[in-house]
């Protein structure tokens, strides 16, 4: 009887440690910072908050001060030239590229741009490719049978 009690205690303790470890692992490796901004802006622009958070995770690892080799800035890694286009579309006055380091604005701009791309492309792979490589580059890929079977979706990303 005593052995069964010890086994049960051990199993409960083991289960607790496993659950705690998994939770800690995900919180460390997949932090959900800026949750309110992500949910609010994803909702405004018709995006899935998890989709937006995953882009932020891949693009900047939730670092609001990230700058890529190509000059993309902030959480969602937006190029200043793209940001100027977005600022105009959103009616943001006196935009300057340093504003891209402001998490709330960067998430708003990124969600706006995703909505813009969603109107132009029909599937997630093509939308994400356009977000990363640029709309013009993706249009070139779509014309190439090596990358697209139908001219509207990518079968592979170069």
PLM features per residue range, with description:
Residues 58-61, 80-88, 133-136:
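Glycine-rich, acidic and aromatic/proline-enriched surface loops and short helix-turn segments
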Residues 126-158:
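Catalytic and substrate-binding regions of cell-wall glycan-acting enzymes that process beta-1,4-linked
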Residues 70-93, 109-110:
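Substrate-binding/active-site groove segments that recognize
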Residues 1-17:
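N-terminal Sec-pathway targeting helices
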Residues 57, 112-119:
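Short glycine/serine- and small hydrophobic-enriched flexible loop segments
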Residues 24-28, 38-41, 64-73, 93-103, ...:
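Second-shell loop/turn segments in exported
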Residues 14-64, 105:
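Export/targeting segments at the very N-terminus of extracytoplasmic proteins
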Residues 51-54, 95, 121-130:
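Surface-exposed patches in mature extracellular/periplasmic domains of secreted proteins
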């Amino acid at each position: 009887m005593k052995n069964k009690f010890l086994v049960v205690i051990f199993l409960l303790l083991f289960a607790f440690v496993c659950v705690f470890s998994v939770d800690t692992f995900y919180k460390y490796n997949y932090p959900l910072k800026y949750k309110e901004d992500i949910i609010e802006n994803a909702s405004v622009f018709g995006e899935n908050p998890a989709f937006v958070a995953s882009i932020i995770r891949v693009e900047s690892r939730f670092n609001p001060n990230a700058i890529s080799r190509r000059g993309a800035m902030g959480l969602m890694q937006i190029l200043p030239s793209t940001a100027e286009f977005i600022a105009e579309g959103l009616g943001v006055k006196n935009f300057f590229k340093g504003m891209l380091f402001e998490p709330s604005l960067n998430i708003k701009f990124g969600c706006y741009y995703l909505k813009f791309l969603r109107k132009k492309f029909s599937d997630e792979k093509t939308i994400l490719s356009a977000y990363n490589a640029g709309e013009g580059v993706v249009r070139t890929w779509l014309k190439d049978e090596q990358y697209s079977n139908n001219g509207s979706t990518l079968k592979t990303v170069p």
